[in-house]
């Protein structure tokens, strides 16, 4: 499912003394089946933009098109349930939203709230629990007996049970250890490929943006500063650092190598294998 934002703007408490501009003239599209990342310093508007993708927030200017549904600023919207069923959002620390007596009931809550029968919701719960790397026996347990990592997966299963066509991820690995972060990100990527999802990742991890995204949207102060492939975005690491962002370790090491040997490699490398291949001729000559 394609998403398109055109001249999108948003103000909190518009036309009041407390009006605050959060988004201004945002123009970006996310192709159906694509994997995109949104990056930017804290306060750049990433999470505000994210909440427009399933109409949790309504634009105060411009419009957003999600599939065949168009949301225009100032136009009253009806039947938003259909849109929200198609666009699933995994927020930071989603396990904080768990509340039911059992894992099964928690996973079933979303689908049943959107009109799915209890029987079908239970079938979905059995399916998605495996998709998030857990087993069926966990369905009868209280979510509050589980480890933090398991609770995170159960909360994600609740989003997947609604069978969304778009998956929006807002810092989905926040608070996890490195191993847990990698497992969760690989899980999302596999789901993205297997289900043909349109995936939008909001992240502070430049490693994840470089590794998974086909396109990166760079934001600053509520506006889109640049849109490009990971290679294009990370080709100017100094500009990202000036914005208060980090760069992938491979990109940082490439910069150190180029300065040390006073050379310019033929491309911005995003993996160790790419960097090794690019450096090999210079290392063979002893840095000539």
From Swiss-Prot:
The keyword Protein biosynthesis does not apply. Keywords: ATP-binding, Cell membrane, Membrane, Nucleotide-binding, Translocase, Transport. The keyword Plastid does not apply. It is an enzyme of class 7 (translocase). GO terms for cellular component: ATP-binding cassette (ABC) transporter complex. GO terms for molecular function: ATP binding; ATP hydrolysis activity; ATPase-coupled transmembrane transporter activity. Its main location: membrane. It is found in: Cell membrane. Disulfide bonds: none annotated. ATP binds at residues 40-47. ATP-binding (A) component of a common energy-coupling factor (ECF) ABC-transporter complex. Unlike classic ABC transporters this ECF transporter provides the energy necessary to transport a number of different substrates. Belongs to the ABC transporter superfamily. Energy-coupling factor EcfA family. This is Energy-coupling factor transporter ATP-binding protein EcfA2. It comes from Listeria monocytogenes serovar 1/2a (strain ATCC BAA-679 / EGD-e).
């Amino acid at each position: 499912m394609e998403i398109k934002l055109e001249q999108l703007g948003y103000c909190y408490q518009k036309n009041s003394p407390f009006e605050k501009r959060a988004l201004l003239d945002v123009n970006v599209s996310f192709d159906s089946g694509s994997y995109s990342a949104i990056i930017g310093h804290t306060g750049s508007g990433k999470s505000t933009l994210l909440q427009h993708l399933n109409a949790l927030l309504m634009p105060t200017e411009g419009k957003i098109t999600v599939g065949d549904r168009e949301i225009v600023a100032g136009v009253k919207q009806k039947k938003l349930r259909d849109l929200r069923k198609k666009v699933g959002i995994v927020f930071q620390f989603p396990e904080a939203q768990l509340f039911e007596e059992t894992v099964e009931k928690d996973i079933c809550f979303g689908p049943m709230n959107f009109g799915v029968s209890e029987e079908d919701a239970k079938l979905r719960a059995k399916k998605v629990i495996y998709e998030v790397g857990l087993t069926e026996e966990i369905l009868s347990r209280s979510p509050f007996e589980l480890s933090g990592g398991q609770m995170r997966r159960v909360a994600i299963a609740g989003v997947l049970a609604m069978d969304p066509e778009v998956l929006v991820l807002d810092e989905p690995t926040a608070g996890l250890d490195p191993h847990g972060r990698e497992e969760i990100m690989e899980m999302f990527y596999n789901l993205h490929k297997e289900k043909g999802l349109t995936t939008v990742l909001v992240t502070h991890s430049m490693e994840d943006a470089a590794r998974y995204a086909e396109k990166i949207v760079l934001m600053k102060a509520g506006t889109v500063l640049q849109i490009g492939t990971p290679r294009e975005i990370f080709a100017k690491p100094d500009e990202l650092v000036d914005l208060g962002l980090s760069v992938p370790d491979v990109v940082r090491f490439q910069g150190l190598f180029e300065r040390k040997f006073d050379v310019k490699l033929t491309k911005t490398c995003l993996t160790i294998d790419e960097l090794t291949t690019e450096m090999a001729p210079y290392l063979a000559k002893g840095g000539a």
